[in-house]
């Protein structure tokens, strides 16, 4: 029986270290004797239901840990479901009852350290690199036990498409990148190449898909790097990734410090392996894979021609003639000059040393999380190549369990955890509910624990040493996406957490306990002000430094805007909300700067509105998500339906897209297509519906014509399950426009948040 453990050390404690006693850490352990027959039957039923319905519902409901927590807390929903007939007849009591049912359920899912656990996954290129890395280093069976491997195979099979391939994400059409690396993953896990049946391996169908689409030479760059590392592709067939970039002066636009932090972290590990032309020691399996992945003999492949090949299914960001010429020039420089005597001795070796110095610094500063699950195995392998028995590699191994998540669909690798992000929003919901029912002491302990988690998770220092020289920006005052140990501050995580802390700070100490020191609130404000660009928008991880024209040269084929840091509407909206509240609570602290920030941020948001009244969402699906954060920011800045044309246009967009049921449902295709796209059959999604409902209420729709709001509320109330949960529907997160991410708690957060708005709106006429 798999169990989620919170805040546990576990594993190799010698090579595991923390900044705050592992607050927020999530790891899974298997104990065959830790369950009753009834519990095991419940888990098996959840697994079977997912497999049976996987063609219809492609993402998990994240049930295993939820069932565990509900059992441990002896949760029982005692409030009957509310069923709404006529939307116009919803009463305050109906709304509050549905809200209370959901709050009591959601409260039971809080961990003892104050955070809300959840999976943050869904990308199908997250798992295989870990398996490949552990296979090459000889640690596969040490890190991934038999039970781990069983669950990983379950996940692979559950998310294989009918045509035999795997998509970039669990709802996506088959793509070469994920089909190739997941095929390799199956083979490493012991699945025979020709074994194939509906319930079996799927290897033969995957191989057929690969060969029918031209073979593995059509894999995108990141996939080609992994194939080259494994020895089933040749480095000469890759676009160059020279380590010399880390030696360029700071005034160079190509200096590594100007890169987007996540791409920089990936590029750092890959460039070391590329610079050394590292190739794994051939094994019988590797030799077999060379024959299985290509329609032609391996020794007949023209690697120089394969360099720019990419399957049309993967090619989201087409490579222009300018790009091809640029990378051809870089290849000539890298291979014909820097990789030959005497430059290979004078420059390349120094570049490799510089790269590893930077890589070790980044790893130490993130407690060996690195930037996420994509750079992590590259960094881990680079450390092993440098010293197979060294502490750097062992420290990486110790953090692998932090990336593993177990759901009813199997074992998946997380981005790196969304503990802080989910918790900040969950606390927004709980605080809003407290405002609805301030006599309810049932959630007091929930609020206290949540506030404690935020307090313990804030970054209180900048990265160590000369962090600028080591390509790290400031961090003090920020909150991360996951936990404090990961160490990367994120602007909207900081804003949402600051907003919560400001609300907590306004509450009586006898209710909430010891309050956060005001200087730490100032630190958070300082960081948000620092993240604002000249155009008024807010970046995500670091201040914008890179030239945007560098995106024209991007070698990444399946994502967009990956080279330099950009500003985002959602981050900007969250920052306005937090700073507007801060201005009310602390009107004398950097007042002019905060007011200027809000003024410029409002202009930025207004300037990015689409002609139809919506805003494109960069981190969620998509126009509903972006519009919610944009309107929320504008309203916090004092804008209303009456005095703000963008809000009027946004409300009109929401009204025009409401379906006959009364809800909203947006397809993930809106993200890559950059055009509002309905779900098939114009069906409803409760997350989109919650976001849209809040936009309408913030836009004053209840005062003009409340019926659209009542209809939306009816959808949410009637969707609620017997235990107070809401149904898991389509995937709702996105990364760089084309990679979808699963946020399992969104179905609780945005529905309950919307019901707090609605319940308060119904209460107003009674006051």
Curated annotation (Swiss-Prot):
Keyword Repeat: yes
Keywords (A to Z) from UniProt: Isomerase, Repeat
GO molecular function, one term: oxidosqualene cyclase activity
Key word Isomerase present: yes
Swiss-Prot/TrEMBL catalytic activity: (S)-2,3-epoxysqualene = alpha-seco-amyrin; (S)-2,3-epoxysqualene = beta-seco-amyrin
GO (cellular component) term, any one: lipid droplet
Pfam families attached to this UniProt entry: SQHop_cyclase_C, SQHop_cyclase_N
Example of a GO biological process term: triterpenoid biosynthetic process
Origin superkingdom: Eukaryota
Active site (catalytic residues): 492
Enzyme class: isomerase
PFTB repeat residue numbers: 149-190, 598-638, 647-688
EC number(s) from the headed UniProt entry: 5.4.99.52, 5.4.99.54
Family affiliation: Belongs to the terpene cyclase/mutase family.
Chain's role: Multifunctional enzyme that converts oxidosqualene to lupeol, bauerenol, alpha-amyrin, taraxasterol, psi-taraxasterol, multiflorenol, alpha-seco-amyrin and beta-seco-amyrin.
PANTHER family on file: ARABIDIOL SYNTHASE-RELATED, TERPENE CYCLASE/MUTASE FAMILY MEMBER
Name of the molecule in the record: Seco-amyrin synthase
Source organism per UniProt: Arabidopsis thaliana
